[in-house]
């Protein structure tokens, strides 16, 4: 438990004591928010908890603060003072921050991987784009958020499994094969009609060209049915390989790639049969309908069409049942915001099968808009279509793309400034963070060149400058931030924490010399920046971003 957690717990216990003493009426306690005051004369931490509690306790905030201060206990606390209308300023004993810093220094980066939690296994499914075309920037945001969330949950001690659901069954794959077939025939000078629901991307033409390069006119002698079957497998294999290559270049990997085909027909049929046995579906107009309105949906949903073909929902019901049957107790899906209407029907299906709907948690991603020179970028200059993830990586790099995707909460629309992402300046947040890491590494090279030995037992009590104290306090909050960000499914909090930590380091560096001062002070400052570097490297690792030694 870090110092802020200890302080929050002490405030909560003081409030509960006051309730037990009959001073405060019973009621739900307000959230306890602790901040570092801008001026050290106002203490090490401050809270407005007394003012937030005035309505609950029906008392003057200053009186609440007085009762709390008289009951707060902690051997790390020197004293507390009441300021203004009811702020409480806390002054820690001199050794507390230094003891915590020593713990982080001696424990190294491993300190920030929290103990394993005894909780249900979590599956995070994300991206899961149809293997019918290239990944676009919207998929890129989902890939960045999903992979960072998996890293974050693991750092917080949760048992996590990541998965990509391959939509390799159904009409979209038939349309893929038909599109490749049409382009193949066109390339060989044959008359053909392009399918009505076909895919027009340049990548489809490229796939057809590769078939011609490898096998020439071989497929002309086959029936259309045979040709479509062959092209379906060729195109699917190629598209999957491209997906995996693009995602790997974006520092995204999955524990499993799950094929929808494995659900057909048995798993889909079994799920529908279970729903029938439970009385959760009914026949109407030749189709099979899920009673999803019983679970809050705005209308019942078809699971088997009147032609006997399962809907996408039927496959999704079977897939989510499969996830739970594999032993995952909590499912996290990351979908685009345009899927918001689909959430209720999947939860309804799980409830109809007898599962708790809250076992499925759906995170909805908002849109990404690209800007260049202050103008909205609507289409790719290369293809005239949506900008692909591959093109984005080529233009700004993986690190910048990932950070910009992650620096806003996933439920916020993202305006992506391409010019800023490419700039090598402090205005570019990822450059600013990486430069802090590289600068610290440079400090250690300078120390080595100067013959300064690192290690030993640093005299942390020598760190008294306000920029040193501010940096110490920040890095000591990191473990708590990991816990909170994981709990809130908010990797953007780690992006912000890394940025703020880098800022405090730069302020410290600009004011305090590290190499070239007396040895005890130099050793303490070297140890401090070593811990700061560990924090930055660990945070960047969660975000899937490199931590360069030189820039």
For each predicted feature, which ranges?
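Non-catalytic interaction-recognition regions
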Residues: 1-98, 105, 109-551
């Amino acid at each position: 438990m870090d110092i802020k957690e200890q302080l929050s717990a002490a405030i909560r216990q003081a409030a509960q004591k006051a309730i037990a003493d009959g001073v405060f009426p019973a009621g739900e306690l307000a959230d306890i928010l602790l901040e570092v005051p801008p001026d050290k004369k106002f203490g090490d931490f401050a809270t407005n908890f007394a003012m937030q509690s005035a309505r609950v306790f029906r008392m003057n905030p200053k009186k609440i603060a007085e009762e709390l201060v008289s009951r707060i206990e902690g051997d790390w606390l020197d004293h507390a003072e009441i300021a203004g209308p009811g702020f409480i300023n806390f002054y820690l004993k001199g050794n507390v921050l230094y003891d915590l810093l020593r713990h982080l220094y001696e424990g190294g980066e491993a300190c920030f991987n929290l103990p394993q939690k005894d909780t249900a296994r979590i599956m995070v499914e994300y991206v899961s784009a149809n293997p019918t075309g290239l990944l676009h920037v919207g998929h890129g945001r989902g890939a960045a958020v999903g992979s960072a969330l998996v890293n974050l949950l693991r750092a917080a001690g949760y048992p996590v499994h990541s998965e990509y659901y391959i939509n390799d069954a159904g009409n979209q794959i038939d349309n893929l094969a038909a599109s490749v077939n049409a382009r193949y025939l066109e390339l060989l000078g044959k008359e053909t009609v392009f399918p009505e629901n076909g895919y027009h991307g340049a990548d489809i033409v490229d796939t057809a060209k590769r078939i011609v390069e490898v096998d020439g006119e071989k497929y002309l002698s086959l029936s259309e049915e045979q040709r479509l079957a062959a092209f379906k497998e060729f195109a699917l294999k190629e598209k999957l390989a491209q997906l995996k290559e693009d995602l790997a270049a974006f520092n995204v990997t999955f524990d499993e790639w799950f094929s929808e085909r494995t659900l057909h027909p048995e798993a889909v049929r079994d799920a529908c049969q279970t729903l029938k046995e439970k009385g959760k579906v009914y026949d109407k107009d030749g189709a099979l309908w899920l009673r999803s309105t019983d679970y809050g949906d705005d209308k019942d949903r078809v699971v088997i069409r009147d032609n006997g073909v399962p809907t996408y929902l039927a496959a999704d019901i079977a897939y989510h049942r499969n996830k739970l049957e594999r032993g995952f107790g909590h499912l996290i899906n990351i979908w685009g915001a345009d899927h918001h209407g689909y959430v209720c029907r999947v939860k309804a299906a799980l409830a109809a099968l007898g599962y708790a709907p809250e076992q499925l948690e759906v995170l909805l991603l908002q849109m990404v808009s690209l800007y260049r020179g202050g103008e909205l970028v609507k289409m790719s200059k290369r293809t005239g279509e949506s900008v692909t993830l591959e093109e984005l990586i080529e233009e700004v790099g993986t690190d910048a793309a990932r950070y910009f995707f992650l620096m806003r909460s996933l439920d916020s629309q993202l305006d992506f400034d391409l010019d800023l992402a490419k700039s090598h300046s402090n205005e570019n947040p990822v450059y600013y963070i990486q430069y802090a890491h590289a600068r610290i590494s440079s400090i250690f090279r300078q120390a080595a060149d100067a013959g300064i030995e690192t290690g030993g037992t640093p005299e942390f009590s020598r760190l008294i400058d306000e920029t040193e104290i501010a940096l110490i306090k920040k890095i000591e909050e990191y473990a708590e931030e990991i816990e909170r960000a994981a709990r809130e499914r908010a990797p953007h909090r780690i992006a912000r924490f890394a940025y703020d930590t880098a800022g405090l380091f730069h302020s410290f560096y600009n004011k305090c010399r590290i190499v070239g001062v007396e040895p005890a002070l130099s050793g303490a400052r070297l140890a401090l920046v070593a811990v700061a570097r560990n924090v930055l490297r660990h945070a960047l690792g969660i975000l899937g971003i490199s931590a360069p030694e030189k820039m």
